[in-house]
Amino acid sequence: VHFATGRMHADEAKPTYYLFIGEDETAGSEADAMLLLADNDKKKEMTFISIPPNTKVVRQEKTNLLLKDTFKEGGAEETKSAVENLLHIRIDKYAVVNYADFRENVSKAGPISLYVEKYMEHLDRDGSFDIGLNQGYQPLDSEQALGYVRYVDKEDGEIGRIQRQERFLKILLSHLQSRMALRNWLTVRYGFCAVESDITPSEAASLAYRLTGYP
C-alpha cells in the first residue's frame, strides 16, 4: 500500500480509480475530504492520494471554484468530473461518506491506537465540545477518530489536517492488514457504510480482501 501526491502517470497496466468523498453536513454539505485510490490488480499494489479540498479548479466557464464547493454545487458527479479534469484520469467508482458513515466504518474496524501529537479541542455552533483529545498515545473510538481527522488549528491549517488524515489512514490500513483477509472481507461485505456510492458491497469487500495481502 502506497501514498502519493501529485498527478498520476500513464502506465501500461492501468489501475482502477476509486474516489472517496468525505461530506461535511454541518457546512452545508461540502466536500470536507477527498481520497483517491488507484488499485492496480496486475501489479498487486494500491496507491492512496489525498486531494486538498481547497484546491482551485477551473471550469469551462473559466471561473475558479474550490474543489470542495463542486460537491455543494453539483453533488458527487460534479466533484468526480472536477477531479478527473484535474488529474487527467477516468474515475471508475466513487463513494460519499458522511460523519455517521465514518463513525460506523471505524467502529466496525475496531479501536485504532495512535499518538495524538497535541491537545485538540473544538466547539460546535452550540458552544459544546465536539472535539476534545488529550495529547499522547491512546486508543480512539469512532467519535474520537472523527475528531482527529477533522481537527484544524491555526498553526498548520489545512495541510496539517491532511497529514493527520493520511497518518490515521496508514494506521487503519496497517490494522486491517494485521487481521485475517476473510475477516476483512466479511466486515466490509456486510458493514460498509456510505450515503451514496456506485461501489457494490462485493466490490468493496474484494478491495479489503486484497488489501490484506499487499505490501
Task: Indicate where each model-derived feature is located.
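Non-catalytic, solvent-exposed segments at the cell envelope interface
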Residues: 1-215
